[in-house]
Curated annotation (Swiss-Prot):
This is tRNA N6-adenosine threonylcarbamoyltransferase. Keywords: Acyltransferase, Cytoplasm, Iron, Metal-binding, Transferase, tRNA processing. One of its GO terms (cellular component) is cytoplasm. It is found in: Cytoplasm. It catalyses: L-threonylcarbamoyladenylate + adenosine(37) in tRNA = N(6)-L-threonylcarbamoyladenosine(37) in tRNA + AMP + H(+). Required for the formation of a threonylcarbamoyl group on adenosine at position 37 (t(6)A37) in tRNAs that read codons beginning with adenine. Is involved in the transfer of the threonylcarbamoyl moiety of threonylcarbamoyl-AMP (TC-AMP) to the N6 group of A37, together with TsaE and TsaB. TsaD likely plays a direct catalytic role in this reaction. It comes from Oleidesulfovibrio alaskensis (strain ATCC BAA-1058 / DSM 17464 / G20).
């Protein structure tokens, strides 16, 4: 079964083809440089860029794969959560293809797809604890199958990825700033007493990162001159990412701030994920840990999750960094998994922007 996946939930336009669970090819275009001018994603600009790019990217993907529309069996698309205008572009395009070619249409939960994407590299083992850490969400799930997700913990305010971007902005680093904080964090040893492990002195499974963001802001104000005076030039950014070369004029304390912030986020995720495993019955009830989302590309977060899985004696599904950020492969793979179970949607499929509950409204077809 060959499945086309379409992702347009935020500021990446991405398409991919999965054939019987294996990735055939993928294309992706990011709008990060465009939105960096505004310090964050501008929804209207994002949807216009998706509309401008999606058709030509589809043509390019099909040409690269040597396929026609008639060679696709299933069309899957991210239906939410995300930005409404962006989602409408992807869902509208998917519906048009399905209507013209007669393929089955599968609407995919973007968050679930992040967690299932690890299955492209290694067979997933269920039941699993899902740890989703992205720019808009920090969620803990019990996952029993590709269709059955139970939310057990979530952020009450800022998501971890949002905290990374806001701290990067405080330091005058470019948007999105998580990768720069990660690289700078390797240039110093963290001070575990510098920043709190927020919202861990309780017995629940929810997160709150607003206090950590405030703690960083307070520290920076008390230690003036820690942030860059101006954003680095592109050449300096590339030197930092590729060769660990500090930008000119970087304050001496900046790597320490990044290392300590990285450690605070990673420790918080470790504490809550370990607590979730205990609540869900531990090794006797949970067989693996799945970590996903853009922040899962952070090296310290990856190390903390590796430690957790090793301590608990569980399989760890940690996708490669390319599969952590928004991509078409995760949508295609999830669509293939669901279609393999006989699940699909009608052409009345609704988009579900952030804030709306995505219903389990699949149509079951035994054939």
């Amino acid at each position: 079964m060959r499945c086309l996946g379409i992702e347009s939930s935020c500021d990446e336009t991405a398409l991919a083809i999965v054939d019987d669970g294996r990735l055939v090819d993928a294309v992706m275009s990011t709008q990060a440089e465009l939105h960096a001018l505004f310090g964050g994603v501008v929804p209207e600009l994002a949807s216009r860029e998706h509309y401008r790019l999606i058709g030509r990217m589809f043509d390019s993907l099909m040409l690269r794969c040597g396929l026609g529309v008639q060679d696709i069996d299933v069309i899957s698309v991210a239906r939410g959560p995300g930005l409404l205008g962006s989602l409408l572009v992807g869902v509208g395009f998917a519906k048009g293809l399905a209507l013209a070619g007669g393929q089955r249409l599968v609407g995919v939960n973007h968050l679930h797809a992040h967690l299932l994407a690890a299955g492209l590299e290694h067979r997933l083992v269920f039941p699993a604890l899902g740890v989703l850490v992205s720019g808009g969400h920090t969620h803990l799930y019990r996952i029993d199958s590709p269709r059955n997700f139970t939310l057990v913990g979530r952020t009450l305010d800022d998501a971890a990825g949002e905290a990374f971007d806001k701290v990067a902005k405080m330091l005058n680093l470019p948007y999105p700033g998580g990768r720069f904080i990660d690289v700078l964090g390797h240039m110093a040893d963290p001070d575990d007493s510098m920043f709190p492990r927020p919202y861990t002195d309780n017995d629940n499974l929810d997160f709150s990162f607003s206090g950590l963001k405030t703690a960083v802001s307070t520290w920076l104000k008390a230690h003036g001159g820690t942030a860059l005076a101006a954003p680095p030039a592109e050449s300096e950014l590339q030197a930092m990412l590729q060769n660990n070369v500090l930008p000119s004029g970087m304050p001496a304390d900046m790597p320490l701030v990044c290392a300590s912030f990285n450690a605070a986020v990673a420790d918080t995720l470790y504490i809550k994920a370990r607590r979730a495993l205990q609540r869900l019955g531990g090794r006797g009830q949970i067989r693996s840990v799945v970590v996903a989302g853009g922040v899962a590309a952070n090296s310290r977060v990856r190390t903390s999750m590796q430690r957790l899985a090793a301590e608990e004696g569980l399989h760890l599904h940690l996708p490669s960094p390319a599969l952590c950020t928004d991509n078409g492969a995760m949508i295609a793979y999830t669509g293939w998994l669901l279609a393999s179970e006989g699940l699909h949607h009608s052409l009345e499929l609704e988009t579900m922007p952030r804030g709306r509950v995505i219903p389990d409204d699949y149509i079951y077809d035994a054939h």
